[in-house]
């Protein structure tokens, strides 16, 4: 199976403390808690993690068998006392996610290998979220959603976020939007668990201290029937960040709040990683308070854990960067691209369509004195909740205006229905698709 041969490393992100001592001090654990407060100039500070018995660090591992977070999570899921990078182990899956692009193929493989009348291993652990090709009249795209709907009815899948009225997404209370953001908002991302999904950006969920990675349709079809998968334990790269956060650094440049952590883990796959993981802390627990009632057990890397390599960054010296065509690693400092003409702007997707992202864009317009946009600017909220936030939350410093009001004032396009939009292309009637013989010279995406 494809996933068993992946040798890409895991990435562990550790923001160091700026003030005081945390519950996980260097004497007992190498972590502290990142927290952003505008009133203290965006300093990274440490806070006390809640002392709750069901959420204390897992006992898996010891000084004699020190492990990283990823190794501990996979050890728990494989019922092993210790794991080392390179080992292949059968891992019990806590959540399997699929969507309208890969779901039909995964379902087909499940039925072929397990039988036409086979039942999934656990109807409450499979999450199906249509999000890619939704607001289109393309018959094949619509058929994909029909296949998901039929399968969920047949299997009595508990978590199917369906959409039937594509003309008005708000008429579909079950519909959420982009799977990676919806998974978090609906409480499916929990510390210490294993989440697999048929999408490369499934690693987004690592922001919650869980092992999350993308798999193919064949693997997903197997998980549907067996509830487990053969995985290779990856080596871990450790990233330590400290210093004061400059005002001009945004979510894609570093991790602070929960949504920004999701952005960082989301982009691990672009760096060649198998998964990214951030230690769960009070910020994580607070986010999950009203989203899940299921118990979970966070784990933390042992102080003696071995890492393939470690990188340290002084965030006070970081600058905004731009990924240029045609590869994510073709990067440059934003100031080096100041003379590049931009043809279109697209704010959206799983990495840039969260509430924090639209807030950041709106604040820039406020700071500019509400200057009009000079190029077409498309807006695609990731989920229904984000769409509502865009229309309801006041933007600081705007006198009470919402993001939508500010975007309208400066000439942006009306926020579209929540989905993956143009990120993956799609049928000809996909929102923001050019449908022209020549591609745009330079499109700026947030």
Language-model features: locations:
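Fe-S-dependent hydro-lyases/dehydratases of central metabolism
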Residues: 2-446
């Amino acid at each position: 199976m494809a996933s068993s041969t992946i040798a890409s490393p895991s990435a562990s992100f550790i923001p160091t403390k700026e003030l005081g001592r945390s519950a996980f001090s260097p004497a007992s654990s190498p972590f502290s808690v990142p927290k952003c407060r505008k009133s203290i100039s965006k300093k990274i500070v440490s806070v006390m993690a809640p002392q709750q018995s069901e959420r204390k660090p897992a006992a898996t591992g010891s000084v004699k068998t020190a492990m990283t977070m990823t190794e501990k999570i996979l050890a728990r899921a494989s019922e092993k006392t210790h794991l080392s990078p390179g080992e292949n182990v059968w891992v019990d899956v806590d959540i399997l996610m699929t969507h309208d692009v890969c779901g039909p193929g995964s379902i087909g493989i499940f039925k072929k290998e397990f039988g036409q009348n086979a039942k999934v291993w656990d109807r409450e652990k499979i999450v199906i979220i249509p999000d890619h090709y939704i607001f289109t009249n393309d018959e094949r795209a619509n058929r994909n959603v029909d296949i998901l709907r039929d399968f969920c009815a047949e299997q009595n899948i508990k978590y199917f976020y369906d959409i039937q009225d594509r003309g008005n997404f708000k008429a579909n209370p079950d519909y959420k939007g982009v799977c990676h953001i919806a998974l978090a908002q609906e409480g499916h991302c929990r510390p210490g668990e294993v989440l697999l999904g048929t999408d490369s950006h499934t690693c987004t969920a690592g922001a919650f201290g869980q092992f999350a990675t993308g798999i193919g349709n064949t693997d997903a079809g197997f998980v549907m029937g067996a509830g487990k998968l053969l995985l290779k334990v990856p080596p871990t790269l450790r990233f330590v960040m400290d210093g004061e956060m400059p005002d001009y650094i945004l979510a894609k440049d570093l991790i602070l709040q929960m949504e920004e952590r999701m952005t960082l883990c989301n982009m691990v796959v672009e760096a060649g990683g198998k998964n990214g993981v951030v230690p769960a802390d009070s910020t994580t627990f607070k986010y999950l308070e009203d989203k899940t009632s299921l118990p979970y057990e966070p784990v933390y890397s042992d102080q003696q854990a071995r890492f393939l390599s470690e990188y340290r960054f002084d965030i006070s010296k970081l600058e905004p960067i731009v990924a240029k065509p045609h590869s994510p690693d073709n990067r440059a400092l934003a100031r080096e691209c100041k003379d590049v003409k931009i043809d279109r702007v697209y704010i959206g997707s799983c990495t840039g369509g969260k509430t924090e992202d639209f807030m950041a864009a709106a604040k820039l317009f406020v700071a500019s004195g509400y200057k009009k946009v000079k190029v077409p600017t498309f807006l695609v909220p990731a989920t229904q909740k984000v769409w509502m936030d865009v229309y309801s939350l006041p933007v600081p410093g705007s006198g009470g205006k919402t993001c939508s009001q500010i975007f309208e004032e400066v000439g942006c396009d009306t926020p579209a229905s929540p989905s993956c939009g143009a990120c993956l292309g799609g049928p000809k009637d996909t929102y923001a698709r050019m449908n022209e013989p020549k591609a745009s010279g330079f499109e700026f995406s947030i």
